[in-house]
Amino acid sequence: MNTVRYVAMCLVLMLQCLVLSAQVFSVHEIPDSIWTRMLGRSYPLGCELQRSDLRYLELSYVDFEGQEHVGQMVCNRQIADDLLYIFRRLYEARYPIASMRLIDDFDADDSRSMAANNTSCFCYRRVAGSTALSKHSRGMAVDVNPLYNPCVYVRSGRVLPPEGKAYAHDRERRKDIPGKIDTADLCYRLFVSRGFRWGGAWRSL
């Protein structure tokens, strides 16, 4: 019996080591293959940032079915290490993320990316309904599970993406919203701990 238990314990430890070794949390200068995908999409003509200002991240994550993936993200180099830290902690906690693809897979269409519940960072674009550049244009903002955590314009009631309307209202008391980010949520706490501000607290929109 002791031998059986010992063998079983060894197998468990081996499996844990395999899982740990499969984790990917890396930061790179923008590879040529990624740069080619970005040009004319998330990095259009006239973008004020330099290629050297940006970093390409590969990040392990767990989806809402518990399946593991390696996602892709482009961000400003100033926050690359912060994002590695945050998403490693989210992965370790098995915090679910629906999708993490470059917004270039959606032709840099923010609405399509959000409707697909895609977590992303850099995209050189204007704030919706404004001439001002978005913080995403500098690679300094991250949308996490944006379908479940839509942007709600306080003044007009407009919801982006529109597909997220079902998750937009009565959020404080509702328990049926998957991946809901609020001030008690791990995702919120990790981002705030690294100096980020939460869009859910904005009142100027």
Task: Identify the function of each model-found stretch.
Residues A8-V19:
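Bacterial N-terminal signal peptides
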Residues I97-A98, S113-L147:
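Mid-length scaffold segments of soluble, non-membrane domains
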Residues Q23-Q67:
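N-terminal module-boundary/linker segments of secreted carbohydrate-active enzymes
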Residues L49-M114:
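Active-site acidic/histidine clusters and adjacent loop/turn architecture
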Residues G40-E48, A108-D110, A128-L133:
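Intrinsically disordered, low-complexity boundary segments flanking structured domains
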Residues M1-A8:
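Bacterial N-terminal signal peptides that target proteins for export
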Residues V127-G129, G139-L205:
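Catalytic cores and adjacent binding grooves of peptidoglycan-active enzymes
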Residues Q23-W35, I86, C123-S137:
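Charged, low-complexity, helix/coiled-coil-prone segments
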